[in-house]
Amino acid sequence: MAELNDYSTMIDILLSDMDLETVTTKKVRMALKEVYAIDVESQGKAINKLIRKHLDLVKERPRFERSLEDLLKENATLAIELTKEITVSKRSSGEEKNDSETKGTHVEKKKGTVSKSPISTRKVTLSKSLASLLGEHELTRTEVVRRLWAYIKAHNLQNPNNKKEILCDEKLELILGKSTNMFEMHKILASHMTEPKKISDCPPLIQEVRRKEKPIVSDSEQSDTKGI
């Protein structure tokens, strides 16, 4: 059971992005399978029990308080990132004003017309070493994990005697060190992913450059606009 408890942090992260009124243990289990790129069905009953335990804890308290309190115990760095994401998400979505709208959304989901992705689709900016390895500067956290596991499997970097241990090659060593395990890897990855900066967060010179990148309006278009 100690091995199963290593999934706790990721279960918390997944639940923080799910609709708690429609979430099922199967959704979380399938998300775990997708993130870790491993078969969790053989441990289905035990994992379901662990998921239900976390889900009960989540429903006892407000979502943002639960994620902060629990994740701080296991991964302070990741918890700080999640705090920033939660704050930005609440401000941009107007979470406090959408209670009535949420109920309507639940009705649509039961009809099968609307479904919420079980994993966050918010992209993050990758460090130079991680971007060089994965070939992208921005990806979702889930896609980072998926591509990294694809690389690990393609280059046979798992210890044959202990599949949880990863024996890094030269490229991967720049990111994870000489060796790591499948659970510690996700904590290390947190330091290689940051939220993309908005224009307002950039230095004045860069702000000016980005503003000048707006599409140029032709003279004819300008005259048409004035006529309107």
Swiss-Prot record:
A UniProt-annotated Pfam family: DEK_C
One GO MF term attached to the UniProt entry: RNA polymerase I cis-regulatory region sequence-specific DNA binding
BP-aspect Gene Ontology terms: chromatin organization; nucleolar large rRNA transcription by RNA polymerase I; positive regulation of transcription by RNA polymerase I; transcription initiation at RNA polymerase I promoter
Chain intervals with Basic and acidic residues compositional bias: 89-111
Residue ranges of domain SWIB/MDM2 in the record: 119-195
SUPFAM superfamilies on file: DEK C-terminal domain, SWIB/MDM2 domain
InterPro entries hit by this protein: DEK_C, SWIB_domain, SWIB_MDM2_dom_sf, SWIB_MDM2_domain
Keywords noted in UniProt: Nucleus, Phosphoprotein, Transcription, Transcription regulation
Residue ranges annotated for the DEK-C domain, each copy included: 1-56
PROSITE patterns recorded: DEK_C (PS51998), SWIB_MDM2 (PS51925)
Domain of life according to the entry: Eukaryota
GO cellular component: nucleolus; nucleus; RNA polymerase I upstream activating factor complex
Region of interest called Disordered, as start-end residue ranges on this chain: 89-118, 209-228
Location of the protein in the cell: Nucleus, Nucleolus
Major localisation: nucleus
Modified positions (Phosphoserine) in chain numbering: 218, 220, 223
Assembly description: Component of the UAF (upstream activation factor) complex which consists of UAF30, RRN5, RRN9, RRN10, and histones H3 and H4.
Function: Nonessential component of the UAF (upstream activation factor) complex which interacts with the upstream element of the RNA polymerase I promoter and forms a stable preinitiation complex. Together with SPT15/TBP UAF seems to stimulate basal transcription to a fully activated level. UAF30 seems to play a role in silencing transcription by RNA polymerase II.
Note: Present with 639 molecules/cell in log phase SD medium.
Protein name: Upstream activation factor subunit UAF30
Organism of derivation: Saccharomyces cerevisiae (strain ATCC 204508 / S288c) (Baker's yeast)
The organism's taxonomic lineage, starting at the top: Eukaryota, Fungi, Dikarya, Ascomycota, Saccharomycotina
Gene: UAF30
